């Protein structure tokens, strides 16, 4: 019986040794498997983020196309006329909420396009806000993004308001010439949307 017990004990010990010999290699395999799963998980997360960016870009393009259908397209911009009167800051906030800004004409072609669009979409309206002001430094006109405006189209004797009139109006009656106005005045406005 002692012999059987010894054989049994040797058998159990050899089985245990076999089990412990494979333990480090199984642990390595598990760690390697975890790394592969984590790499695949990171790759999937990256792909999902990329898809969300593409979906958001498509939504933005669709919104721009909707704006262009309701307004007009000029070069790489869409213009959309306002429905009501607002003072300068409210008008710009309204444009921003729609994905654009107050319109800033950059050349005489855009002045002509704005004049024509203004006549069609704002009949009977004499003037409307532009996204230009000199609120920071008197006489230094900046666009709504804070950049200096290089193209200016002032009417005779304008700007004339000094520190009281810091925002810029587009005048239909003066063939698209500009004048300065108190920013708290309520005026119509046109939003512009840049088409990428």
Swiss-Prot record:
Domain spans labelled C-type lectin: 74-192
Annotated Gene Ontology cellular components are: extracellular region
Cystine residue pairs: 68-78, 95-191, 167-183
Q: Does the keyword rRNA processing apply?
A: no
In Gene Ontology terms, what is one molecular function of this protein?
carbohydrate binding
Tell me the Pfam families matching this sequence. Lectin_C (PF00059)
Q: From which residue to which does the signal peptide run?
A: 1-22
Q: Which InterPro entries match?
A: C-type_lectin-like, C-type_lectin-like/link_sf, C-type_lectin_CS, CLec_Tetranectin-domain, CTDL_fold
Name where it mostly resides: secreted
Q: Which UniProt keywords apply?
A: Disulfide bond, Lectin, Secreted, Signal
What is the protein name for this chain? C-type lectin domain family 3 member A
């Amino acid at each position: 019986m002692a012999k059987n017990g010894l054989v049994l004990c040797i058998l159990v010990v050899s089985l245990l040794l076999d089990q412990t010999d494979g333990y480090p290699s199984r642990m390595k395999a598990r760690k390697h498997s975890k790394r592969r799963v984590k790499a695949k998980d990171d790759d999937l997360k990256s792909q999902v983020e990329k898809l969300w960016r593409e979906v958001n870009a498509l939504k933005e393009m669709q919104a721009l196309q909707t704006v262009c259908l309701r307004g007009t397209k000029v070069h790489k911009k869409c213009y959309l006329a306002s429905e009501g009167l607002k003072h300068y800051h409210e008008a710009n906030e309204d444009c921003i909420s729609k994905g654009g800004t107050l319109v800033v004409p950059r050349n005489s072609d855009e002045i002509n396009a704005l004049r024509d669009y203004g006549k069609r979409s704002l009949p009977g309206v004499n003037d409307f806000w532009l996204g230009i002001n000199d609120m920071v430094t008197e006489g230094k006109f900046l666009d709504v993004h804070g950049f200096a405006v290089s193209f200016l189209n002032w009417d005779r004797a304008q700007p004339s308001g000094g520190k009281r009139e810091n925002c810029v109006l587009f005048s239909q009656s003066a063939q698209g010439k500009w004048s300065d106005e108190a920013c708290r005045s309520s005026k119509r406005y046109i939003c512009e949307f840049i088409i990428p």
